[in-house]
């Protein structure tokens, strides 16, 4: 068994996690009390994300971390109380990376002890999943500290993150979010193996377009995030012949370590109220939609110069694997995907098993995970906003009181700039020997 331990850090991370565990429970036939409701053989590996307690209740392999109780106090009872960390201060990190990181330094050993205990309960721990936002205080700051500590304590384990990026096209109530983002990106780049990127504006726009509702709520957006996370882990939880470990998925998506930013696309997305409306969709329809910018969950527009390093489509409901092969060949022949010139086209497809407890609005649904040189635009926007603040030396004092010196900002910017330039270089035929 290749187990996965999930780390939910901060308000955003715990809201993502709450919806994710609802989805996993539904797919594996487990109640939100941890009781098995579906005794059929589902062909699944429940033990990847859950363990069974002595009373046979299924308990998530998860650590919940926050500095204020509002979200974490609503966690279902089947979470182990020994795996929930809540600061005694109870006031949150005030959208300050330095505050979150400082608390992490002071209290990080308590969380590491929880992680060690969870790891010891695994037969063959493979992966840590971090769920967080990069722009606030706790998910960014405390999350950064945990990334550093996990890489020290578990250097051979995979660290994958689902990282929510800010609305870079819009003004924000959190004026220091470019600082928080760059400081977090520094730790993500140095301490993680794969960074799955979603941004708030793209999530909101896609939810609005898909559900056709006036104003999407956080519940709708978290449902979309959890749908993506469940789909991206489906071949691990319901294993087939390929891509049944995080190692195999990461080897596919991240051929070279500097290129580790992955953007998901998903179609079709519905909420429970819409699941009764059945739509017709073929394998070709779904794979074509996954290439459209509007299904992409981190907002950048592809231009001809920006190329795909690697792509993995995970499809559910496809009965004819030959249809997949024909669709891929047609896409390649028509040049519908612009791949990097320095390696053969990496257009990979995994056919997920039918999930008995999943309600789909169409026969076929699909997730695409794409590592593209377009990630440079995401990093460039954050870097540009950071430069505006840094040039004015604005708000540095509120970080300095938590021990964050100006040099740390400059180090972070340098690391982000190197990652950005690496993706620029990856567009050239001479890469990686440039």
From Swiss-Prot:
**Positions contributing to GTP binding:** 135-141
Species of the source = Encephalitozoon cuniculi (strain GB-M1)
Keyword match Zinc: no
Q: Which Pfam families match?
A: Tubulin, Tubulin_C
The record's keywords, sorted A to Z, are:
Cytoplasm, Cytoskeleton, GTP-binding, Microtubule, Nucleotide-binding
Q: Which family, according to the similarity comment?
A: Belongs to the tubulin family.
Its biological purpose: Tubulin is the major constituent of microtubules. The gamma chain is found at microtubule organizing centers (MTOC) such as the spindle poles or the centrosome, suggesting that it is involved in the minus-end nucleation of microtubule assembly.
One GO cellular-component annotation of the UniProt record comes to: spindle pole body
What name does UniProt use for this protein? Tubulin gamma chain
């Amino acid at each position: 068994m290749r187990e996965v331990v999930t780390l939910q850090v901060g308000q955003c991370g715990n809201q993502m996690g709450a919806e994710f565990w609802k989805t996993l429970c539904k797919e594996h036939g487990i109640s939100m009390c941890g009781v098995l409701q579906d005794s059929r053989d589902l062909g699944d590996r429940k033990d990847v994300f859950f363990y069974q307690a002595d009373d046979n209740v299924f308990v998530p392999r998860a650590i919940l971390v926050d500095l204020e109780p509002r979200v974490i106090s609503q966690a279902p009872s089947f979470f182990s109380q020994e795996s929930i960390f809540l600061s005694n201060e109870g006031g949150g990190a005030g959208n300050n990376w330095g505050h979150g990181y400082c608390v992490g330094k002071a209290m990080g050993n308590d969380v590491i002890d929880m992680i060690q205990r969870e790891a010891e309960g695994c037969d063959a721990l493979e992966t840590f999943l971090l769920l967080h936002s990069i722009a606030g205080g706790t998910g960014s700051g405390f999350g950064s500290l945990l990334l550093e500590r996990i890489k020290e304590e578990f250097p051979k384990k995979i660290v994958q993150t689902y990282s929510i990026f800010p609305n870079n096209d819009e003004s924000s109530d959190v004026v220091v979010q470019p600082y928080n983002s760059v400081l977090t990106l520094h730790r993500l780049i140095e301490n993680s193996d794969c960074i799955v990127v979603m941004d708030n504006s793209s999530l909101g726009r896609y939810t609005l377009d898909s559900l056709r509702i006036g104003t999407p709520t956080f519940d709708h957006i978290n449902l979309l995030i959890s749908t993506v996370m469940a789909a991206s882990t489906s071949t691990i939880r319901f294993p087939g012949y390929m891509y049944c470990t995080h190692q195999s998925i990461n080897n596919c998506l991240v051929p070279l370590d500097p290129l580790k930013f992955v953007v998901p696309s998903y179609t079709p997305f519905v909420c429970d109220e819409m699941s009764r409306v059945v739509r017709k969709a073929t394998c070709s329809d779904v794979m074509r939609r996954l290439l459209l910018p509007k299904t992409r969950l981190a907002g950048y527009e592809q231009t001809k110069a920006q190329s795909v390093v690697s792509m993995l489509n995970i499809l559910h409901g496809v009965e004819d694997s030959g249809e997949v092969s024909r669709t891929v060949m047609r896409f390649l022949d028509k040049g519908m995907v612009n791949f990097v010139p320095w390696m053969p086209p990496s257009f990979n497809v995994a056919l997920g098993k039918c999930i008995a407890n999943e309600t789909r609005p169409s026969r076929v649904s699909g997730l695409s995970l794409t590592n593209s040189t377009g990630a440079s635009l995401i990093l460039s926007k954050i870097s540009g906003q950071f430069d505006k603040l840094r040039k004015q030396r604005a708000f540095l004092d509120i970080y300095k009181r938590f021990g964050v010196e100006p040099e740390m900002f400059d180090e972070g910017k340098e690391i982000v700039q190197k990652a950005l330039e690496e993706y620029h270089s990856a567009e050239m035929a001479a890469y990686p020997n440039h």
